[in-house]
Amino acid sequence: MIQTNIGYNKKYEIIWLVSEKRKFRNQNTGNVKFVTAENKYGWSSPLAYYYGATAGFFFYSHNSAGLNRYRCKGQTVVNLWHGCGYKDAEQGKKKQNIKPDFDYALVPGPVFVKTKSGLWNCEPDRLLMMGYPRYDWMLHPSMSKDEILDSLFGWKGKKVVLWMPTFRKSDLGGCAENEIELPCQLPAIQDMNELKELDSYLREQEIILIIKKHPLQTEWDENEQEFTNIRYVAEALLEKKQIKLYELIGISDGLLSDYSSVAVDYLLLDRPLGYVLADYNIYKEKRGFVFEDPLEYMPGEKIYNVCDIRKFMKHLTDGTDSY
């Protein structure tokens, strides 16, 4: 939105409400400002409230932080949201009879108009079936596959599978996922020996498995030195290398996911997709799903153990994709 070749900044004054303003000191785009909102101490600049109240258009993704609670008449509020997947709303946030704080919200397609209009207690015509801005990075990465792999790991010319497990353990209080016990942080993996054996198999198949750490997941206990073809990636590394997560997704040859919205997003690429469902029953009990039968909405291989992961990798190398 701040790219000058698009030209929005010539028509509008653009205000970005950011938690770390210092990161944008080198941004010198005309008619664009950065204002502190919800920094690490929870503080927001008075300017954030001013612009939040007086802006003609107010966009947010996770929550508005109340910055536009006193908005002026005529302001249009758009909830960009952060993805529609298979998870049900967290306990305590279901069927609340509250008025939504937006005029419009984005969803990937018609099936999610029904689920989100029920969750947010809003009219279906408020939900715009436009997908999410992050799709642009996935469909049109600014770097080539080899450039991204070389920047992150010094690799080139490898087949890449990205594994993006949702969180099971986090520091967030009241999360139903915290009650889910797994033998390993990675669902479908029983212990480190299985992971080492998988690493050996990946080496034979000449596939790199990149495991993206969920930012809410705690208790990661990996030792990359023990592997040749498995690597872990966190937000900090991507930020350091100036690579967007959805660019990394966009250059991958296949994806392992589970109940997250990234699996829905990945359908746009029409590439091999595997759903890791080792804890499906307990997840359904603790968190629940938005669909009565979520398996009907999962057009990819169903994976329950490490043998299924190997099958997925084998299918990737020989070009088998039943979906």
Where are these regions (language model features)?
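Conserved catalytic-core segment of nucleotide-activated headgroup transferases in glycan assembly
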Residues: 1-6, 13, 134-226, 303, ...
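Tryptophan-centric aromatic hotspots in well-structured domains and transmembrane helices
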Residues: 16, 77-81, 120-124, 163-170, ...
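Donor nucleotide-activated moiety binding/catalytic core segment of transferases
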Residues: 39-55, 215-264
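Catalytic binding pocket for nucleotide-activated donors in carbohydrate/polymer assembly enzymes
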Residues: 224-229, 234, 259-323
